[in-house]
Structures are given as structure tokens and as C-alpha cells.
């Protein structure tokens, strides 16, 4: 998908090709998921995962979910375009150790900071670790 993204940015391919590539990637992930999550892994905790409000991309998030399930974590997948309030409510309900936030669009990256601020306001920030990820995310942003 990195190559597809670069070709799209360079104008070599367009939205229809991007959609076909994403669909193909998802089908491939569906095939390998049982292999990645097979076996008896010790339960290591609960991770809430979601793509932030305004972003509809989930391939990277879904890859991380498969790897974390394979490592023994229970995953609560909130999907894409997740509202801050819904993330906060789920953190309270699930008592998770980790919250994973995903963004592919640079325009949605500020939502991650808003989620962290909302966690602080709700008195939840020190109760869990927050992981941010996505193609545009780097160490400086994190």
C-alpha cells in the first residue's frame, strides 16, 4: 500500500485504482489473519483501537489489531471515524490498559491530540497508555 500511496501522490494512479488496491489488501489480510492469531497466547490485557474522527482508513489499524491479537491482547475495535466521546466512553467501560489511535490523513492528526486532552479532562490519561500511528505519524508528532 506504500507503493500505491506514492503512485497516487505522483499522479500515476487515481482513486479507482486506490480502491481496488485497498480491497485486494483487505482480502489478503482476511486470508492471513487466522495464521497471525493462531495458537494459545497468554492474555496480556485489553487494547481499544480506533481511527480518529474524520478518517475512514483502516488497513494499518487492522494489521496492528491482528498482530496484537496474536500476541495475546483482547482488542476492542471501534472502527473508523470514531468520535472523541465514544472513545472516552469505551475507555471507561472496558478499563483498557492501552488506547490505540490511527490516522492516515494529515488533516485528522490533530484529532489525536484532542483525544488525549479529553482523556486528561476526564481524569483517565494516567490510567492507560496511548499509542498513535498511521502513515504520516512520526516520532516528533508522537
Where are these regions (language model features)?
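Domain-level signal for soluble alpha/beta catalytic cores
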Residues: 1-141
